[in-house]
From Swiss-Prot:
Cytoplasmic side: 1-11, 73-81, 224-238
Residue positions the entry lists as glycosylated: 130, 150, 172
Swiss-Prot/TrEMBL keywords: Cell membrane, Endosome, Glycoprotein, Lipoprotein, Lysosome, Membrane, Palmitate, Protein transport, Secreted, Transmembrane, Transmembrane helix, Transport
Single GO BP term: cell-matrix adhesion
Membrane protein topology class: Multi-pass membrane protein
Subcellular location: Cell membrane; Lysosome membrane; Late endosome membrane; Endosome, Multivesicular body
InterPro entries according to UniProt: CD63_LEL, Tetraspanin/Peripherin, Tetraspanin_animals, Tetraspanin_CS, Tetraspanin_EC2_sf
UniProt short sequence motif Lysosomal targeting motif, positions renumbered to this chain: 234-238
Name under which the protein is recorded: CD63 antigen
């Protein structure tokens, strides 16, 4: 028995949402990978809220893509089991995204404190490790900052002369510009406030995006349930 306009419209909107979910899934994976690459150069990798968040985002994105595919198959074939599975898994993803959003908000200051701790540790290793030198120099050049709190932090590094800072602190970076420097020729602001603040704000953006996607997924769940009810009633929505 064919269903008139209303259910056909629901099925069409569900297809549109499934395409949107696929796009969101790809976006989440891209954001997660990008965040992971950034965090590799800013905070110590380990089981911390800051470093685990990108992994969760990537996993949610991959799972959302798979669930969207299941939903598409279920809608095309009007398969009751597939649509129920789609609705259940989409509900789980929505709950995870809400949890990610809450975690991002709760741990926003934790990300900044982790960065502060790690940046100071990297400063201690700066003269001894070429990889650390590369990471710290890139951060100081890109964010136009110097030291943790400010440029004077470099004076407390054992293997650094008190009369110099890394060349990456200079406004105009040239070899040896950090030796016997003049304050007006270097960036005085510390990196913790600049980079940590940038990380904190981006965590909040990701949290807000997760809530936005979760809201759209609620619509997907509603439409899926409507289609499930129609299929269970023995209707055929062409």
């Amino acid at each position: 028995m064919a269903v008139e306009g209303g259910m056909k419209c629901v099925k069409f909107l569900l297809y549109v949402l499934l395409l949107a979910f696929c796009a969101c899934a790809v976006g989440l994976i891209a954001v997660g990978v990008g965040a992971q690459l950034v965090l590799r150069q800013t905070i110590v990798q380990g089981a911390t809220p800051g470093s685990l968040l990108p992994v969760v985002i990537i996993a949610v994105g991959a799972f959302l893509f798979l669930v969207a595919f299941v939903g598409c198959c279920g809608a095309c074939k009007e398969n009751y089991c597939l649509m129920v599975t789609f609705a259940i898994f989409l509900s789980l993803i929505m709950l995870v995204e809400v949890a990610v959003a809450i975690a991002g908000y709760v741990f926003r200051d934790k990300v900044m404190s982790e960065f502060n701790k790690d940046f100071r540790q990297q400063m201690q290793n700066y003269p001894k490790n070429n990889h650390t030198v590369s990471i710290v120099d890139r951060m100081q050049e890109d964010f136009k900052c110097c030291g943790a709190a400010n440029y004077t932090d470099w004076g407390s590094i054992p293997l650094m002369s008190k009369a110099r800072v890394p060349d990456s602190c200079c406004v105009n970076v040239t070899q040896g510009c950090g030796i016997s420097f003049k304050v007006k020729e270097i960036h005085e602001e510390g990196c913790v406030e600049k980079i940590g603040g940038w990380l904190r704000s981006n965590v909040l953006v990701v949290a807000a995006a997760a809530l936005g996607i979760a809201f759209v997924e609620v619509l997907g769940i509603i439409f899926a349930c409507c289609l499930v009810k129609s299929i269970r009633s023995g209707y055929e929505v062409m």
